[in-house]
Amino acid sequence: MFYKYNAWDPKLIIGQILSIQCLYYILLAGILYLLDSMFSSSLSLEQMFEYQSINTHSQSGRVVMTAFLINSLFGSFCLKYIVERSKKCLDHSATVTFIHFIIVWIVSGFPKTVVWWAIQLIGMVIMAMIGEYLCMRKELMDIPLQRGKDLDSTPITIPPSPHTSSPIMNPKNNSNGNSGSNNNNNNIFSNSINSSGGSSSSINSIGNSNNPYQPIELEILTHQDKQDEHDD
């Protein structure tokens, strides 16, 4: 229920304590009702909150002892579904026992019988140990990966990039670049720059105009070279 919450959250911790404490008393009342019905005992709140009710020399006292021990088993399942952390089970078990001790102290005074203390400590240990075992098994359960497999099998469409049309980025175009360059050598880009002194330079790029990464051959003709070619 609260497994995904790992950060310190006082409201969450208080909610867990109250939930476990309420379930502890609800389950204890239900167990006492069943046992009292079986052994013809009278159900009362004194069985829960008076330390004198737990004793070994009367049938009602033994019924209350049995009810507290059985309730510790059910309390461990409360830890499994509410706490869900094995390292926190002992803390919550001790908290439940301490709160019950405070309530009993307020209702009937400070507990003075060894039997009451023994039953409470044994119940706390049972609740903590079984709760840790159940929570540990839940923590070690395999995570279902069916949804992850479905997501992995979904095809992902990647929009084409403007650079994919480049011959260097595209292996098919790159393999045909050499053959296409021989057929497109007639595409010549010329740029003439006239200087202020009347001399001019002509830059001719010969290559594949469709391949921007093709090596460019430069031919620089000065004004004197052009005059020599004209005389020849």
UniProtKB/Swiss-Prot annotation:
Residues 163-211 have a biased composition (Low complexity). It is found in: Golgi apparatus membrane. It comes from the Eukaryota. The keyword Protein transport applies. GO terms for biological process: Golgi to endosome transport; Golgi to plasma membrane protein transport; protein localization to Golgi apparatus. It is a multi-pass membrane protein. The keyword Cell inner membrane does not apply. Residues 151-232 are annotated as: Disordered. The chain crosses the membrane at residues 12-32, 63-83, 90-110, 114-134. Keywords: Golgi apparatus, Membrane, Protein transport, Transmembrane, Transmembrane helix, Transport. Its main location: Golgi. InterPro entries: Integral_membrane_SYS1-rel (IPR019185). One of its GO terms (cellular component) is cytosol. Residues 220-232 have a biased composition (Basic and acidic residues). Belongs to the SYS1 family. Involved in protein trafficking. This is Protein SYS1 homolog. It comes from Dictyostelium discoideum (Social amoeba). The gene is sys1.
